[in-house]
Regions:
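Acidic, serine/threonine/proline- and glycine-enriched intrinsically disordered segments
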Residues: 1-91
């Protein structure tokens, strides 16, 4: 239980690294999520925290990518957009 609590805290307190792209940060966060299946954080909470901690440029890029406010979109749209950005960066 202690490890789950520790890993949940890592996920909850996740910060993108300076100069890290959206795709890199999302990939790193997804790795944390995968390693801690019992994190009990909703997808909305995960995205909300991640978005709030992105650089201004990266937040603007997400808003532009969805032709409006990223955070006003539904959760499936937001999750899928981040997945597409990550997948496209791997090509």
């Amino acid at each position: 239980m202690h490890l789950v609590h520790r890993d949940r805290n890592y996920i909850y307190n996740f910060w993108p690294r300076e100069g890290e792209s959206i795709a890199q940060a999302w990939g790193r966060l997804k790795s944390m999520l995968y390693s801690c299946h019992d994190h009990e954080l909703s997808r909305e909470m995960i995205i909300q925290k991640n978005y709030a901690r992105l650089s201004d440029n990266n937040r603007t890029m997400l808003d532009t990518s969805c032709a409006g406010s990223f955070m006003m979109k539904n959760i499936d749209f937001k999750w899928d957009l981040l997945e597409r950005i990550k997948r496209n960066s791997e090509d």
